[in-house]
A protein has these predicted regions:
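Alpha-helical transmembrane segments and their immediate juxtamembrane cytosolic regions
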Residues: 1-369
Length: 369
């Protein structure tokens, strides 16, 4: 099951343009594109049933179910796993396995601390710090997936993923909530939410539990490992056509498996259920196949340039957006215009963001962690 060294993979281009573009596409939604789309649809199609359907897709599900916007976060973690599969063998070759492992842990620590900072950790008391959040989950999941990929071959990674997903599901079926005796998936009354309320210090996003909580980080690691597996496939598939076919087929199989599991272990983003992992990873693979085919195989890439700008500095832009810098600039622009600010502000905000990302790219400023 274990491999003595990282698999030696065939040489590929140092950057896969579609991977950078899809990362930028994904981050663009996080940074405000969904708000801009909602504003435009509300403004120009207020009574359209189609517009209402689209608006619903740009919101998270309250609990069980799946929307397009529920894909955005796990897609980023999936792509982080792919990046590990591509970058780690090169780092091991240059610096050795121990140095690569130390780098993974250092990066995870930096992301964790940045996540605390993002949630106003420097201005609040210890009891008001949100210790778990988006950046913390990205750091932990990607580091864990990277460390696993240093130690395990592909078969070992598959077994580990299954163990994480099945083990997490078993907790909900076998371990009752001590305070209520409940087994299951009710919001606020399940084992994952209970562990958050009893173990995680500081401020929880939902007061008594957190959508980026402690137990639900385990299946998030599986999301990243599935990305590692996809990355290894890209490296070893042999031809662009086979790469695309494998991503499409594997993605659709995962989507089907996730929804087949849904009646027994529902698709719920806020506790990162195992069925949710499969559905999200499946659609992530399908999206990557489409981007890879269009950009890297067919060479139709000019349309993706704005996404490449964002994908080159995703974490830096995320932190700046969290400081409301782009929104404040958008509000100032909208305030000086004669149009209603309710829908103009989100448009101005994403425009400022794009212009700043373009400037960073033109100046070759790439902030890596």
């Amino acid at each position: 099951m274990t491999a003595p060294s990282v698999p030696q993979l065939p040489a590929k281009p140092s950057r896969i343009a579609s991977l950078d573009a899809l990362r930028g596409f994904d981050m663009f939604w996080i940074l405000g594109l969904h708000e801009a789309m909602n504003a435009l649809l509300h403004k120009f199609f207020p009574d359209s049933s189609c517009a209402k359907m689209l608006i619903a897709q740009f919101q998270h599900k309250d609990w069980a179910g799946f929307t397009f916007y529920d894909l955005i976060f796990p897609l980023f973690i999936f792509l982080a796993g792919i990046s590990q599969a591509i970058a780690l063998p090169r780092r091991v070759e240059r610096e050795g396995k121990s140095a690569a492992a130390i780098h993974l842990l250092q990066r995870a620590l930096i992301l964790f601390l940045l996540g605390v900072f993002y949630n106003n950790g420097l201005t609040n008391g210890w009891d008001q710090i949100r210790w778990l959040g988006v950046l913390q989950r990205i750091g932990i999941a990607s580091a864990a997936a990277g460390l696993l990929s240093l130690c395990l071959n592909t078969r070992g990674l598959i077994i580990t993923t299954l163990a994480l997903l099945i083990g997490y599901a078993a907790l909900f079926y076998l371990v009752p909530v001590p305070t209520s005796g409940a087994r299951g998936f009710e919001m606020g009354n399940n084992i994952a939410n209970y562990v958050d309320s009893m173990v995680v210090p500081g401020r929880l996003h939902q007061k008594t539990w957190d959508p980026e909580g402690l137990l639900s980080t385990l299946p998030a690691i599986a999301s990243a490992v599935l990305g590692v597996l996809a990355g290894r496939w890209i490296q070893t598939s042999g031809s662009p056509e086979r790469t695309v076919l494998g991503l499409l087929t594997g993605g659709l199989v995962l989507v089907f498996a996730g929804w087949a599991w849904h009646p027994f272990f529902p698709v719920i983003k806020k506790i990162w259920t195992s069925s949710y992992v499969l559905v999200a990873a499946g659609w992530s693979a399908v999206l990557l196949a489409l981007f890879y085919w269009v950009i890297d195989v067919k060479g139709w890439s000019s349309w993706s340039t704005p996404f490449l700008w964002i994908g080159a500095n995703p974490i830096a832009l995320y932190l700046l957006a969290g400081m409301q810098l782009f929104q404040k600039a958008g509000e100032r622009i909208a305030g000086k215009a004669s149009l209603p600010t309710g829908w103009l502000t989100p448009i101005a905000t994403v425009t400022v963001l794009l212009l700043f990302a373009r400037w960073l790219s033109r100046e070759k400023i790439f902030i890596r962690i």
